[in-house]
Amino acid sequence: MELKCLNWFENRGNDSRFLFLKARRADNAVVYLRFVQHFYYVVRADAVADIAQPLAWTRALGPMSVVSIDEIVARSAKIPERQRSEIELCLVASERKLAPPEVFMSDFLNVSWFFVAHDIDPDGCYRVDPALLRDLGSNCFHCDDPGACFAEKIPRFNVTRSGLFLDIECHFEKKFPSVFKNAVSHISFCVVDKDGAERRFTLTNSDMLSDADLEEAARREIPVCLDPADVKFDAEVTLCPEVTLLRVAKRLLEMPLDFVVTFNGHNFDLRYLDSRLSLLTGEHIRFRLPDGTETVNFCVYERTKSSHKGVGGVSSTTFHINNNNGTIYFDLYAFIQRTEKLDSYKLDAISKNAFHCTAVVEDARPDAVRFRGDRSTDADGNAAVFARVLSTGNYVTVDERVCRVLHKRVDEDGFTVDLADPAARAPGDRVTLAFGKDDVSLADMYANYSLDVCLDMARYCLHDACLCLYLWSHYGVETKIAAAASTYLLPQSVVFEYRASTCIKGPLMKLLLENRTVMVRADTKSKFFYEGGRVMAPKQKMHNKHVLIFDYNSLYPNVCIYANLSPETLVGVVVSDNRLDAEVAAVDVRRMFPAPRYIAVPCEPRSPELVAEVAIFDREAKGIIPMLLRSFLDARAKYKKLMKAAETAVDREIYNSMQYTYKITANSVYGLMGFRNSALFSYASAKSCTAIGRTMIAYLERTLDGASVCGTRLSLAAAPDNPLLRDEAFAGRAAELEIDAAVAGERTERVGFRSVYGDTDSVFLEVGASDIAFSRRVGRCLERVINEHVLFANFKVEFEAVYCNLIMQSKKKYTTIKFAVSDGGGSERVSKGTSETRRDVAPFHKLMIRKYKDMLCRALAEEGSGNVGVEILRSLEDELTFEFEARSMPLDWFLLSRTHHKNFKSPDNPNVALVTRYNAANAEAIEIGERYFFAYVCEEGPWRRRIANVKSYERVVDKTFRLDKNERIMYEVYFKRLCTEIVNLLDNKAMCTLFFERLFGSKPVFTG
């Protein structure tokens, strides 16, 4: 029979360890295969006979090169030789744990050994001989010989995965529901069966309705079911007692589906359902192995990693379900937190980020506005995706205002929707529509609960359940799971539970075995500080000319490949504690380790008493890390090619996920070299990687800073060379080149280039022109010249974008208009690292900083940066004075947010005292890890130029907070922070200082 692997999982018992495969046959039938799960050990071949415990099997690995990867540090160029030996090794498998005196390759997971030992792709398709299987009943079979069973791999075939997407609502009186006294009011399900058929329905708690409401429900013919067996899944809403509702949920969750998907359900929804079921009935959600030998109760287990590096120093905890039935329980919240960098990870913010489109106003009435979205309004195809979400949505966000849906019409290509939008609109206006959660107050709905409220809530709950399905599809989670399992040699059920240091172990183990290499350590891993990538200080604040952006392609992976950086290729590290010894050692290193076979990398010393440090790598025999990286990059290129040639959307999505997974994995290798708990840890390699990266970015800047174009001549600022090794290929390369006359076009004057900023792997190059067509042409020309004439080996750059009206606030903080590099490409406003992208900044601050940046951009485009500052500061002072006197903006515009924590090392630890005072006076306490809002409030009075102890004016703001008559917003704090950011956008420090002293009685803090 032909099988497609869907998920590998283990039993939970300790007596007999089995590994199970959930697979789908070509005819779509579900099949389970069971294998004995062994412990794997690599030992000396001559030591196998000394193992007293019974072994399941042994396999000779043959002679393997055992290499010590301890770091060799010397005071001179006379470096001791690295220990290498060839040993006959053997792989042994046992059903019980062993304790051999000497074990090799012990860092790797048993399940990865299973896949490698039997040459199995966890996500592959295979032709399996039924004669090799023993029938256990219920479509479950036992296999004693996995290698023979999976010997014939066949071309991929696709199947439709079954899934359950759900959301619950619970009655609550305070901020959070209590499982002991708050009932589950609604559970909404979206079920997709293995044939792709979709059902959506909601169960509501009839116990919470009055007799009159139940009579009204009967008149409306809303089904009421007392017994779980009577519940039909074709009704949109069904009323039933809470116990019935919970038992139906239990039945659905115990089904052998491929996926159960929730948003933060592992921590709340699923846990709440099981706890409530246990409390009311004594029953539990239970999972059963396919062979029927083991049944386990639902349980959530937690993995916690404490760190003070995160916001507020709150522990990072992930939640996992202990099921054993082959279903993958997937939490979208944890996945998106791990893979996306967003301002907020609430469902509302994630939905807005994922589902938005441009629409036009078709009709505008006082009570409603009709919007249309299709390919004519949004060419990127967002309208079709938006239409699908609109099918269940009840509210739409229009330019940051949430509007209720009054009427909607949805088809495959687009939609029309009538919204209760109070803004003044005219036919033809273009707006951005976005989806968040429905804008309803659950507290108010529960306080005024009735049948109509219950049905409204059902629509709200169903939309949240369907949002899980929409986000699942949007992020391509299914294909990402499959790609990760195949890449990392891990079961699908755990690929996103592990960190990169564990995920890399499967590919690393496979590569080591293929190259017959074993890496061993005797010393304790030691890690010292080392410098990261080079981030240049901005040379000026505002740029009225175009800036070309050039990025190195995969800089760190290519550094590792070029310099052959790997723990076993490290010849040694030469350190010196005085200048004389350092100079002598440098001469000896060049003589004893000549290029190009060796590369000597000067690095920053590892301790203050040293003055020099040089790491030497042998480039002759390829190292494990470069080979690993090359395999990832080659695999990525292969899947990108397959993606372009794919005939179906499903195949295209699968290959796209594969190439993306290999890209992420390759980029993570550098970080793992510097991570002490990683199997790839190599302090010298990680430090050398960043040192070479800094050299390469400085080389590119040196070559381009001062270059120019005049007619058909391109003059580089310096003649190209190889900054890492003496390279004969660069002999005679000139700094001047002939280029295509079409690049300059009609221009006859000389156009110069100036480096204005650089960050790790990118260079910002200002071009002395403001013609976007010319900037694009010259950028593409420079990309070709750099790659063909300036760079070498595997180093390449990419012309990424043209920035117009660039405003550099400081390192890693800028705002600009970004133009695509292709002719006719569009543009967008981009802010990186600024207050506009932070969620702990007041909306007033964001509004004003965006307004003044736009004003700066317009001024730069019209008149340059000469007299911009005067107009900016004059306008700013007028606006702030007006707001202070008129107080036109509500308190909401001045709210800040912060996560409550107890990290006393944090500079904002006074939040503990603030929250303690609030909790003492309020029933709804702020809990550790919870985000709360606060504002600066003071007594009514005139403007205060000097303020002491700013934090003493903080007040927690909840839904009941109101300003007293003798209180006001402390505008001085907000205005000072805003003005500090704005003056840092301007070049005239003297003028900014005078402005600041006049308003606030102090000098501003200027950042780099």
Swiss-Prot record:
It holds the Pfam family DNA_pol_B_exo1. Keywords: DNA replication, DNA-binding, DNA-directed DNA polymerase, Nucleotidyltransferase, Transferase, Viral DNA replication. It comes from Orf virus (strain NZ2). GO terms for biological process: DNA-templated DNA replication; viral DNA genome replication. Its EC number is 2.7.7.7. InterPro entries: DNA-dir_DNA_pol_B, DNA-dir_DNA_pol_B_CS, DNA-dir_DNA_pol_B_exonuc, DNA-dir_DNA_pol_B_multi_dom, DNA-dir_DNA_pol_B_vir_insert, DNA/RNA_pol_sf, DNA_pol_palm_dom_sf, DNA_pol_type-B. It catalyses: DNA(n) + a 2'-deoxyribonucleoside 5'-triphosphate = DNA(n+1) + diphosphate. PROSITE patterns: DNA_POLYMERASE_B. This is DNA polymerase. Interacts with A20. Component of the Uracil-DNA glycosylase(UDG)-A20-polymerase complex; A20 and UDG form a heterodimeric processivity factor that associates with E9 to form the processive polymerase holoenzyme. Belongs to the DNA polymerase type-B family. The gene is POL. It comes from the Viruses. Catalyzes DNA synthesis. Acquires processivity by associating with a heterodimeric processivity factor comprised of the viral A20 and D4 proteins, thereby forming the DNA polymerase holoenzyme. Displays 3'- to 5' exonuclease activity. Might participate in viral DNA recombination. Does not perform translesion synthesis across an abasic site. GO terms for molecular function: DNA binding; DNA-directed DNA polymerase activity; nucleotide binding.
